[in-house]
């Protein structure tokens, strides 16, 4: 079937989004054109501005339109002395929603993966080393994902911390709240048992 070249181009562009296949892209394109053209225009304008104006924070490497993001420039956060290392900016949003972390962050934008040719410098560890040497950091919290690559990355960074004389800690992994033990995989259960804590009354 012959369709409008612009419509085809729109559907192809929408497929760059994760989880969006041909059918989903077609549905999105038709919905915007049929029912919400003003929404489509707002989306286009927001995308254009974001793609051209959003860069990386000079300190933590998260997304921001400023030289230094709001978290890194916050005096209270600076005084705290804790830095949480995460794999992506999305992880910062997840942690910030808990309201439990008062420090700053460092975003790797990935993890070590020798098989894919991703080494320490590719995920900004040279910059992290500079910060370990020049800043007064009380604790580096390693919040990389609980995958083989995430664990390897955390161990590598922990070695950098040891060399710099900075305390390093790893976030706990274990049974999710509301979960049932029989549904938990063996590796997660092993982490839960190893990371158990005493109940004090």
From Swiss-Prot:
One of its GO terms (molecular function) is DNA binding. The gene is recR. Residues 81-176 form the Toprim domain. The lineage of its organism: Bacteria, Pseudomonadati, Pseudomonadota, Gammaproteobacteria, Enterobacterales. This is Recombination protein RecR. GO terms for biological process: DNA recombination; DNA repair. PROSITE patterns: RECR, TOPRIM. It holds the Pfam family RecR_C. Coiled coil: none annotated. Belongs to the RecR family. Keywords: DNA damage, DNA recombination, DNA repair, Metal-binding, Zinc, Zinc-finger. A zinc finger (C4-type) spans 57-72. May play a role in DNA repair. It seems to be involved in an RecBC-independent recombinational process of DNA repair. It may act with RecF and RecO.
């Amino acid at each position: 079937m012959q369709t409008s070249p612009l419509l085809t181009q729109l559907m192809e562009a929408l497929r760059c989004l994760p989880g969006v296949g041909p059918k989903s892209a077609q549905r999105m394109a038709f919905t915007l054109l049929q029912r919400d053209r003003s929404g489509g225009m707002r989306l286009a304008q927001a995308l254009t501005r974001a793609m051209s104006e959003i860069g990386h924070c000079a300190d933590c490497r998260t997304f921001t339109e400023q030289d230094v993001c709001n978290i890194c420039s916050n005096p209270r956060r600076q005084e705290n002395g804790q830095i949480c290392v995460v794999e992506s900016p999305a992880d910062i949003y997840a942690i910030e929603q808990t309201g439990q972390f008062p420090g700053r962050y460092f975003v790797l934008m990935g993890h070590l993966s020798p098989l894919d040719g991703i080494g320490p410098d590719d995920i900004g560890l040279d910059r992290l080393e500079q910060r370990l040497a020049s800043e007064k950091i009380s604790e580096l919290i390693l919040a990389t994902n609980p995958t083989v690559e995430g664990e390897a990355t955390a161990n590598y960074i922990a070695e950098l911390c040891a060399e710099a004389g900075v305390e390093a800690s790893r976030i706990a992994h274990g049974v999710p709240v509301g979960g049932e033990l029989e549904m938990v995989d063996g590796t997660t259960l092993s982490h839960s048992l190893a990371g158990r804590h005493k109940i004090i009354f």
